[in-house]
């Protein structure tokens, strides 16, 4: 991915990653939401690739707390491996927020600007969504409007879940209406969490009203605090994003994002690449000698109807799938072993999972290093938006429906868990 980098190579991108991401638990019980795997990669990696493709080479993670920092640093380090793996040259440089506790996403940006002496315009993106952004077009919009801050706006159907913008004819944001009803929403354009910001925001952080806001609320968040404050002063414009934007902040949103990418040809091309020529709408990853050998074995099984890969299916590297198994509209990550006559539908299976014979997994997420015990005479069911955390052992014949299981737990054989959180 050796592309022209001027003038964007000097621009810094800040990615606040704070909080405990409770809405995604148990997937985030022991790791940052930014590295939760989707399409067989850490979630935030797609943001880095999208921006690096356009010439960005400097990223800073505003990681709050040990779990967020450890998760991000252990995977990305300072960017050398990420750059090599994705063939990005010149390489990407990744920095981290020092151990200075912030009180919100905007406060994290304040800390990063001060610590890394940021004196130029910069971009802020989030670690829990997938997006396509024409950054040069956004910069052109900012230059035309002379906006102090530009907020990326994206169309949404479920306006009740987002902050929705009310703008004037010039694009200036009058206000955001938080989670309005469909009837009262001023528009369908929601805050994407993508911000292009003037370095002059340094002076805003020092204003008495902003300091009082922090003292009173114990918080300085973009959506709740800083953007409303700036919008009241006419300093914020809304940029209508032309590319896709997908929220991945809850298990339901996660599976919805998987479905929407798998079903949309343009999104599939961006996130999955080209499908196999022999199997329409099937992607099997891996380019090493052993990966190719296993890929070819799976293709032969599918072509001879020994396994069924229906709808749109993504399979990771070094997977083993036994006869009679059906995978439909789902993702299976690297190093997974699926037994005989397994059924996986509209689900996401993360890496290094073992699933026993006859198991049925529907509309659910199975975390990393999970063993689903199951047999043809005592099958296990995982259904109804169940979410299984990492390193869980599920006994044969168990039933999980709308259940959540924390990491490292054991679910007994023939257990019946309906709508419960196994903590």
Over which residues does each language-model region extend?
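Left-handed beta-helix
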Residues: 1-10, 200-203, 209-423
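N-terminal glycine-rich phosphate-binding loop and ensuing alpha1 helix
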Residues: 2-81
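Alpha-helix/helix-capping structural signal
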Residues: 19, 67, 136, 199-200, ...
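Well-ordered alpha-helical segments embedded in enzymatic catalytic cores
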Residues: 43-47, 107-111, 225-226
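A recurrent flexible, glycine/aromatic-enriched loop bordering the glycosyltransferase active site
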Residues: 158, 181-194
């Amino acid at each position: 991915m050796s592309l022209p980098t001027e003038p964007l190579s000097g621009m810094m991108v800040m990615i606040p990653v704070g909080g405990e991401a409770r809405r995604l638990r148990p997937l985030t019980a022991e790791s940052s939401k930014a590295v939760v795997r989707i399409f067989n990669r850490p979630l935030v990696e797609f943001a880095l690739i999208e921006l690096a493709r356009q010439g960005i080479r400097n990223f800073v993670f505003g990681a709050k707390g040990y779990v967020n920092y450890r998760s991000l640093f252990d995977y990305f380090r300072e960017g050398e491996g990420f750059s090599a793996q994705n063939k990005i040259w010149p390489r990407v440089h990744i920095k981290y927020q020092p151990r200075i506790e912030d009180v919100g996403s905007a406060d994290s940006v304040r800390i990063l600007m001060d610590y890394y002496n940021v004196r130029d315009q910069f971009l802020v993106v989030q670690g829990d969504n997938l997006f396509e952004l024409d950054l040069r077009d956004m910069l052109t919009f900012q230059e035309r409007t002379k906006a102090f801050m530009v907020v990326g706006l994206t169309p949404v159907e479920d306006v009740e879940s987002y902050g929705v913008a009310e703008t004037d004819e010039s694009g200036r944001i009058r206000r955001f209406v938080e989670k309005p009803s469909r009837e009262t929403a001023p528009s369908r354009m929601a805050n994407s969490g993508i911000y292009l910001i003037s370095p002059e925001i340094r002076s805003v952080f020092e204003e008495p009203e902003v300091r009082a806001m922090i003292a009173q609320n114990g918080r300085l968040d973009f959506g709740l605090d800083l953007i409303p404050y700036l919008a009241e002063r006419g300093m914020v414009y809304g940029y209508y994003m032309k590319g896709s934007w997908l929220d991945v902040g809850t298990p339901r949103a996660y599976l919805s994002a998987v479905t929407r990418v798998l079903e949309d040809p343009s999104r599939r091309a961006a996130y999955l690449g080209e499908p196999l020529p022999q199997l329409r709408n099937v992607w099997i990853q891996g380019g090493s000698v052993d990966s190719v050998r296993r890929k070819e074995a799976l293709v032969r099984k599918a072509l001879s109807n020994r396994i069924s890969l229906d709808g749109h299916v993504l399979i990771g590297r070094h997977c083993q799938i036994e006869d009679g198994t059906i995978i439909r509209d789902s993702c299976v990550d690297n190093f997974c072993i699926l037994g005989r006559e397994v059924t996986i539908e509209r689900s996401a299976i993360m890496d290094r999972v073992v699933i026993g014979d006859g198991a049925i997994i529907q509309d659910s997420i199975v975390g990393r290093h999970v063993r689903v015990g199951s047999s043809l005479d005592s099958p296990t069911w995982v259904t109804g938006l169940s979410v299984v955390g990492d390193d869980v052992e599920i006994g044969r014949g168990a039933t999980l429906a709308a259940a959540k299981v924390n990491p490292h737990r054991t679910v007994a054989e023939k257990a019946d868990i309906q709508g419960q959180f196994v903590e």
